[in-house]
């Protein structure tokens, strides 16, 4: 009987595979990391160069370039990587599609380069979270939670431009550009009156409240292991089996502060709730952006209440509508003479009275 003896020497490819998937590395790489690292590096390098030195971009496609970089007079607040031109629309616009590098810069090519590499990179980051959890035998909920901010980024950088028909409608990569995107989004889609946005606000602010409540309750019910002269933090040893705080005391305090059933008596269900609340809220916001991308907008109650003489009784909805029109006439002011809402025919008010029959 012959026995096949495998050579003890490892090939370079096998050594590389072992290194990539080794969970003992200081920072886990993983196969998703092989995709993530170059994509995020490319996005970061291009963003940094463009934010500092990119020439003005013809964002509206009307030969009126908008400057966004620092060396063209902006500061950290006003600077941005300007979205690609409306003349490009939804066309894929890599460097080799332009006649020259100057043309690529003029039409906002860096915006597409940054966004596409960034979206691939953060998607791979989510895959890397799952991959590391799988190799360590953990449950997969970390990457599920991360899918909420990932879906939000996908909504504003990919889905919304697709729905509107041009990457020039994507969110600019800067602080004031983000605020401009929010104002224009409200003007065109009435997002404040969309239920999914309301759920997102509840998720973000509720998550902040619950996080602060949980942290303060735990910190206030620590089991003292030190003297008064020492910090309580020294009473905890990493990996210790004993509870570091008294959950019964925290439960009793909060149950008496609100009422008994407002307080969790199960640590696992408590932490699931803390994770699920903001995640579900941000999921809803992403779905709201994605539906409004195709102009399924927020509720519109403009001029919906009339008196017996048919005169409009203004409500908060009418105040909001006037603010929307003001924001709409101010943006892209040279790209069109009138915003669509003002150029359209007079709208028929919805009255709160039954029509006359016969």
UniProtKB/Swiss-Prot annotation:
Class of enzymatic activity (EC top level): oxidoreductase
Binding site for pheophytin a: 125
Post-translational modification note: Tyr-160 forms a radical intermediate that is referred to as redox-active TyrZ, YZ or Y-Z.
GO molecular function: chlorophyll binding; electron transporter, transferring electrons within the cyclic electron transport pathway of photosynthesis activity; iron ion binding; oxidoreductase activity, acting on diphenols and related substances as donors, oxygen as acceptor; oxygen evolving activity
TM region positions: 28-45, 117-132, 141-155, 196-217, 273-287
Site positions per UniProt: Tyrosine radical intermediate: 160
Main location: membrane
Residues annotated to bind chlorophyll a ChlzD1: 117
Reaction equation(s) it catalyzes: 2 a plastoquinone + 4 hnu + 2 H2O = 2 a plastoquinol + O2
Chain sites annotated for binding chlorophyll a PD1: 197
Pfam families for the chain: Photo_RC
A single BP term in Gene Ontology: photosynthetic electron transport in photosystem II
Family: Belongs to the reaction center PufL/M/PsbA/D family.
Other remarks in the entry: Cyanobacteria usually contain more than 2 copies of the psbA gene. 2 of the reaction center chlorophylls (ChlD1 and ChlD2) are entirely coordinated by water.
Protein name: Photosystem II protein D1 2
Organism: Synechococcus sp. (strain CC9605)
Organism lineage string: Bacteria, Bacillati, Cyanobacteriota, Cyanophyceae, Synechococcales
């Amino acid at each position: 009987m012959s026995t096949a003896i495998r050579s003890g020497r490892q090939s370079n490819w096998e050594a590389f595979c072992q290194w990539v998937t080794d969970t003992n590395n200081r920072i886990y790489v993983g196969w998703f990391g092989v995709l993530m690292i170059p994509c995020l590096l490319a996005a970061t390098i291009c963003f940094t160069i463009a934010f500092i030195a990119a020439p003005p971009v013809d964002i509206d496609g009307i030969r009126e370039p908008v400057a966004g970089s620092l060396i063209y007079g902006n500061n950290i607040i006003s600077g941005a990587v300007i979205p690609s031109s409306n003349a490009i629309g939804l066309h894929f616009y890599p460097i080799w599609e332009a006649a020259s590098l100057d043309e690529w810069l003029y039409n906002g090519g860096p915006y597409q380069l940054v966004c596409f590499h960034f979206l691939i990179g953060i998607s791979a980051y989510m895959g890397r979270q799952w991959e590391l959890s799988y190799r360590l035998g953990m449950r997969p909920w970390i990457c599920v939670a991360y899918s909420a901010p990932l879906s939000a980024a996908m909504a504003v950088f990919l889905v919304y431009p697709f729905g509107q028909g041009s990457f020039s409608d994507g969110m600019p990569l800067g602080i004031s550009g983000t605020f401009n995107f929010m104002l224009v989004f409200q003007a065109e889609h009435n997002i404040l009156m969309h239920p999914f946005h309301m759920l997102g606000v509840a998720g973000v602010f509720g998550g902040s409240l619950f996080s602060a409540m949980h942290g303060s309750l735990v910190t206030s019910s620590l089991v003292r292991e030190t003297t008064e002269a020492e910090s309580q933090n020294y009473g905890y040893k990493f990996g210790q089996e004993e509870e570091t705080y008294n959950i019964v005391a925290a439960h009793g305090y909060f149950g008496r502060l609100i009422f008994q059933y407002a307080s969790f008596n199960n640590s696992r269900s408590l932490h699931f709730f803390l994770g699920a609340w903001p995640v579900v809220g941000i999921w809803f916001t992403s779905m709201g952006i994605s539906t409004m991308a195709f102009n399924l907008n927020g509720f519109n109650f403009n001029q919906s209440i009339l008196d017996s003489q048919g005169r409009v009784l203004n409500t908060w909805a009418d105040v909001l509508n006037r603010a929307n029109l003001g924001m709409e006439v101010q943006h892209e002011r040279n790209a069109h003479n009138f915003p669509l809402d003002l150029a359209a025919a007079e709208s028929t008010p919805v009255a709160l009275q039954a029509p006359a029959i016969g």
